[in-house]
From Swiss-Prot:
This is Thrombin-like enzyme bhalternin. Glycans are attached at N44, N81. Expressed by the venom gland. It comes from Bothrops alternatus. Keywords: Blood coagulation cascade activating toxin, Cytolysis, Disulfide bond, Glycoprotein, Hemolysis, Hemostasis impairing toxin, Hydrolase, Myotoxin, Protease, Secreted, Serine protease, Signal, Toxin, Zymogen. Residues 1-18 form the signal peptide. One of its GO terms (cellular component) is secretory granule. Residues 19-24 form a propeptide. Its EC number is 3.4.21.-.
Length: 260
C-alpha cells in the first residue's frame, strides 16, 4: 500500500511538471548558455526592445523596426535575474539601414535591417563571440535555429527570463507568398517555420538571428499574430544578399550602394 502511494505521488509530480513545462514554452526550450554568444539585447529606458546579432567586435546587425531613441546594447546575457561576470553594455556610435523597394504588404516598409556600430569594441569573453556573415545562401529544407527573449505565449505577452531556442525549417519563398498576401514575386527575404504550426519566433524576437547549418542566414523581420499558426511561417531578411554591402560599410566605404 505504501509503495502504491509513493508511485501515485511520483506520477502526480511528473504530470504536474509536464503541464508546467508545456505552459512555459511555445515550441522551444531554454537555449544552452553557450549557443547564443552572438545574441544581443537591445533596450532603452522603456525596457526590452529587440534582439540582434554581433557580427564582429564593433558591429551588430538587427531589424530596422528596432530603431529607437537612446538604445543600449547588452551582450553576454543569459538570465535577466542572474548576471554573468562577462556581461557588457554598449551604446551605438552610428546606425546604417538596409533599404528595399516598398511592397504592397502593409507590414513592410522601405527599411528592413539596421547595422549598428558600437561606440566601443566588445571585449572577448566566454559568453560573447561574433557570428560571421554567411559565405553562401541557405538551401530550402535546411533545419534552422531561431532564438531570442521574445514572448513564449502565442496570444499574450509573456517574456521569459532566459532566451529560448527552437528548430524550424527553411521553406520555399512561394510558401510565404501564399501565406501572406501582397508579397512580390521575388524578394531578398527567407521563409521559415513549421507548416504544422507550434514552433515560431514571436513578439520581442524581432531582429534576432536565423542560423542554418551554423551560419547566420536571416534576421527576423515579421510574422503573423498569434504566433505559431499552421501554414503561417515567418519572414526573415536574407543576410547573404547583403553580405558584400555590409562588409563594405564596415570597411569604411559609406558611399556603397545597397542592393536593390
Amino acid at each position: 500500500m505504501v509503495l502504491i502511494r509513493v508511485l501515485a505521488n511520483l506520477l502526480i509530480l511528473q504530470l504536474s511538471y509536464a503541464q508546467k513545462a508545456s505552459e512555459l514554452v511555445i515550441g522551444g526550450d531554454e537555449c544552452n548558455i553557450n549557443e547564443h554568444r552572438s545574441l544581443v539585447v537591445l533596450f532603452n529606458s522603456s525596457g526590452f526592445l529587440c534582439a540582434g546579432t554581433l557580427i564582429n567586435q564593433e558591429w551588430v546587425l538587427t531589424a530596422a523596426n528596432c530603431d529607437r531613441k537612446n538604445i543600449r546594447i547588452k551582450l553576454g546575457m543569459h538570465s535577466k535575474n542572474v548576471t554573468n561576470e562577462d556581461e557588457q553594455t554598449r551604446v551605438p556610435k552610428r546606425s546604417t539601414f538596409v533599404s528595399v523597394a516598398k511592397t504592397s504588404h502593409q507590414t513592410l516598409g522601405t527599411r528592413t535591417s539596421m547595422l549598428i556600430r558600437l561606440k566601443r569594441p566588445v571585449n572577448d569573453s566566454p559568453h560573447i563571440a561574433p557570428l560571421s556573415l554567411p559565405s553562401s545562401p541557405p538551401s530550402v529544407g535546411s533545419v534552422c535555429r531561431v532564438m531570442g527573449w521574445g514572448t513564449i505565449s502565442p496570444t499574450k505577452v509573456s517574456y521569459p527570463d532566459v532566451p529560448h531556442c527552437a528548430n524550424i525549417n527553411l521553406l520555399d519563398y512561394e510558401v510565404c507568398r501564399e501565406a501572406h498576401g501582397g508579397l512580390p514575386a521575388t524578394s531578398r527575404t527567407l521563409c521559415a517555420g513549421i507548416l504544422e504550426g507550434g514552433k515560431d519566433s514571436c513578439q520581442g524576437d524581432s531582429g534576432g538571428p536565423l542560423i542554418c547549418n551554423g551560419q547566420f542566414q536571416g534576421i527576423l523581420s515579421w510574422g503573423v499574430h498569434p504566433c505559431g499558426q499552421p501554414h503561417k511561417p515567418g519572414v526573415y531578411t536574407k543576410v547573404s544578399d547583403y553580405s558584400e554591402w555590409i562588409q563594405s560599410i564596415i570597411a569604411g566605404n559609406t558611399d556603397v550602394t545597397c542592393p536593390p
